[in-house]
């Protein structure tokens, strides 16, 4: 029997939102998981507390020097049963990110148990509609109140929950417009591109805003050395379908190792598609398009799962992929992947982790 996590109960519970108007990241549940770290006693006081503001020092090192990492995963409900999707992979990546920023690693099993108990307490918040889920955001930041660049001796970990609606607002995938960034870079090898650190996202915002002003949804980043090889999209890994083969840039230390990316690769192979992980230059991609070999492009990530790319612009040239329609392989992967997530298709890989009732 797992040890129960201490719970500090609220006096009153929130009114739950209309599930037809959820959107993404707008509403938060009644409770959150809290965990503190001090250098002299390690991680301690794992507990579930009411969701609300927290108090930190104005000199908290995480605010000044950027020691802050996060994760994102989801829980799904079907016929009253709630299941997490590959949470072990998220906590492994969380520890990799923590190590890169010289932050203390967590006990993955202990944290997963705490998450299960939190989600069980909040299971009434898990929406059950088509494409809906409970978004889960674990994050860790430095809290020691002292100035001076150096690793903090104190940290706080929180996990907050947000009921979220269908990403596309309906059953049809909507192709996105992508702008290839050729001035700014996201990351370089030896840096923090492989880690899910807050600063990576802050550094991407200027290019993202510029792309939005030009009418594009997201930015496709090139490598930080030659600005020649494709790496990833702002919030997604990227895939290409050429002559029926599924291709994605190989992990090189500057690309985030997405859990959705990893799962899509495994799933595509299981479905009989040839999958190739390798370097892909932007010039090669456009040449493949000109030859009629590039038939589909899609991104993968926790929020959208799979997002087809309909338009791609690089320098002064814009191409339209598959007549701006979702490709056959893209749709197949999306249907099977989401079917496994929400429990309507068999989970042959053991990716779903059912949340017990404590």
Curated annotation (Swiss-Prot):
Cofactor(s) the protein needs: pyridoxal 5'-phosphate
InterPro entries: Aminotrans_IV (IPR001544), Aminotrans_IV_CS (IPR018300), Aminotransferase-like (IPR036038), B_amino_transII (IPR005786), BCAT-like_C (IPR043132), BCAT-like_N (IPR043131), BCAT_family (IPR033939)
N6-(pyridoxal phosphate)lysine found at: 196
The protein's annotated pathway: Amino-acid biosynthesis; L-isoleucine biosynthesis; L-isoleucine from 2-oxobutanoate: step 4/4; Amino-acid biosynthesis; L-leucine biosynthesis; L-leucine from 3-methyl-2-oxobutanoate: step 4/4; Amino-acid biosynthesis; L-valine biosynthesis; L-valine from pyruvate: step 4/4
SUPFAM superfamilies attached to this UniProt entry: D-aminoacid aminotransferase-like PLP-dependent enzymes (SSF56752)
EC number(s) per entry: 2.6.1.42
Key words, A-Z: Amino-acid biosynthesis, Aminotransferase, Branched-chain amino acid biosynthesis, Pyridoxal phosphate, Transferase
Enzyme class: transferase
Annotated Gene3D superfamilies: 3.30.470.10, D-amino Acid Aminotransferase, subunit A, domain 2 (3.20.10.10)
One term of GO molecular function: L-valine-2-oxoglutarate transaminase activity
Annotated catalysed reactions: L-leucine + 2-oxoglutarate = 4-methyl-2-oxopentanoate + L-glutamate; L-isoleucine + 2-oxoglutarate = (S)-3-methyl-2-oxopentanoate + L-glutamate; L-valine + 2-oxoglutarate = 3-methyl-2-oxobutanoate + L-glutamate
One of the protein's GO biological processes: L-valine biosynthetic process
Function of the molecule: Acts on leucine, isoleucine and valine.
PANTHER family assigned: BRANCHED-CHAIN-AMINO-ACID AMINOTRANSFERASE (PTHR11825:SF44), SUBGROUP IIII AMINOTRANSFERASE (PTHR11825)
Family statement: Belongs to the class-IV pyridoxal-phosphate-dependent aminotransferase family.
Protein name according to UniProt: Probable branched-chain-amino-acid aminotransferase
């Amino acid at each position: 029997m797992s040890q129960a996590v201490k719970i500090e109960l609220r006096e009153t519970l929130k009114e739950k939102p209309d599930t037809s108007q959820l959107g993404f990241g707008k509403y938060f549940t009644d409770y959150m998981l809290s965990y503190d770290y001090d250098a002299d006693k390690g991680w301690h006081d794992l507990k579930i507390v009411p969701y609300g503001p927290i108090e930190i020092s104005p000199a908290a090192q995480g605010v000044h020097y950027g020691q802050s990492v996060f994760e994102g995963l989801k829980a799904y409900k079907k016929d009253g049963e709630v299941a997490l999707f590959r949470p072990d992979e998220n906590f492994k990546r969380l520890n990799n990110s923590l190590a890169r920023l010289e932050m203390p690693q967590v006990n993955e099993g202990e944290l997963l148990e705490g998450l299960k108990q939190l989600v069980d307490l909040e299971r009434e918040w898990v929406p059950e509609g088509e494409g809906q889920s409970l978004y889960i955001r674990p994050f860790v930041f430095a809290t020691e109140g002292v100035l001076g660049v150096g690793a903090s001796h104190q940290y706080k970990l929180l996990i907050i929950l947000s009921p979220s609606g269908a990403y596309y607002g309906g059953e049809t995938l909507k192709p996105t417009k992508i702008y290839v960034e050729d001035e700014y870079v996201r990351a370089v090898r030896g840096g923090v591109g492989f880690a899910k650190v807050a600063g990576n996202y802050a550094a991407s915002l200027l290019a993202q805003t510029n792309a939005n002003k030009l009418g594009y949804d997201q930015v496709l980043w090139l490598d930080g050395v030659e600005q020649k090889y494709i790496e990833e999209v702002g919030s997604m890994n990227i895939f290409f379908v050429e002559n029926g083969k599924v291709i994605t840039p190989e992990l090189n230390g500057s690309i985030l190792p997405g859990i959705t990316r990893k799962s899509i690769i495994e799933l595509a192979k299981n479905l009989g598609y040839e999958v190739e992980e390798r370097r892909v230059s932007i010039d090669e991609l456009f040449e493949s398009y000109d030859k009629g070999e590039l038939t589909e492009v899609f991104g993968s990530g926790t929020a959208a799962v799979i997002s087809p790319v309909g338009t791609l612009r690089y320098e002064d040239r814009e191409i339209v992929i598959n007549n701006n329609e979702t490709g056959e392989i893209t749709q197949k992967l999306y249907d099977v992947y989401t079917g496994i997530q929400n429990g309507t298709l068999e989970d042959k890989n053991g990716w779903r982790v059912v949340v017990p009732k404590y």
